[in-house]
Amino acid sequence: MTALDKALVAPKNLNEDELAKMLASTDEGLWREIFAAAREVKAKCGKTEVLPRGLIECSNVCAKNCLYCGIRKGNDKTVRYRMPEEDVLGCINEVRRRGYPAVAFQAGEIEGEANTAYYERHIAMCRGLEVTLSLGEQTEEVYRRWKDAGAMRYLIRIETSNRELYAKIHPAECSFERRLGCIRMLKRLGYVTGSGVMIGLPGQTIDDLAHDIVFYGDENLDMVGMGPYVAHPDSLMPDSRYQLPTTNYQLSLRMIALTRLYLWNVNIVAATALEALDPENGRRRGIDAGANVIMTNLTPAKFRVGYDLYPGKVKT
């Protein structure tokens, strides 16, 4: 039985070595079979319907200085903003007008009472909508308060499951253990919990990416949001490449397909970063590869320009 045959029998039926060998393959015929198999599993699990989420980028103020990020604390070229309540409410109303069942609040990572209360108020405005938060590392008390206010899902990206690589792309004050602890805390508190990685980081290997997929399963994630690494001109990242079998874009599509084959029933986001590299077809190809969630950016244009995570970031 081939690895692909095994993947179609049951979830988590591939080992890390098999995932790595598939990721490293340059056989286009094999990849056509893998993408078709991912679609087959998606249909088998009832994941063919694309789930829309209205995305609101509430603030680009961030206390973290992650080396890769355009809105990192140390980037003094970024004009900072925090959306006033009336603008947030306007976005929530637009989510309802479009008939989307869910809204997602995303922002730079800030802790403190003012920030906690800001999102409590906005979550309370979303009655009748499913609320996803992507607001980074917080205390257990804060996560509890937001859940009590009505939040249902939380996405906190680990960016890489390789601790050594994590340390290379973050300043010393950013703790891998704390971030992993937040993922586990969110699960324990009853959130529908998601995480994900960047694909194509300097120093990253195929073995790292295969381990990332296994990490998703080991942590029993409900959602996965991952996408290609797109270098920001104001980044502090080293300008180095490793040898990949293909581009960050193609490898991201392959990661989506293999994550679907490994986890089966998970919700996978077709990341906006795919359209930074393929503006016409990026997210559609993500859906074809096995994803089933689309985030539509509803942030007003006057704020959206400031949420500059990476070059070419899609504005819709």
Predicted stretch roles:
Residues T139-W146, P202-Y216, A276-D288:
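Catalytic cores of alpha/beta
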Residues K47-D87:
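Canonical Radical SAM [4Fe-4S] cluster-binding loop centered on the CxxxCxxC motif
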Residues I110-E113, C182-D208, M226-D234, P245, ...:
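Conserved strand-turn element in the central/C-terminal portion of the radical SAM core barrel
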Residues K73-L89, V95-I183, V192-I199, D222-G225:
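Core AdoMet radical
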Residues R53-I56, D76-V79, V103-T116, E164, ...:
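Glycine-rich, proline-tolerant flexible connector loops at the mouths of alpha/beta enzymes
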Residues M1-D27, R96, G217-T316:
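Auxiliary Fe-S-binding modules of radical SAM enzymes
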Residues M1-K64:
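Flexible, acidic/Gly-rich N-terminal and inter-domain linker regions that tether
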Residues A38, C66, I156, L186, ...:
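Conserved, mostly hydrophobic/aromatic
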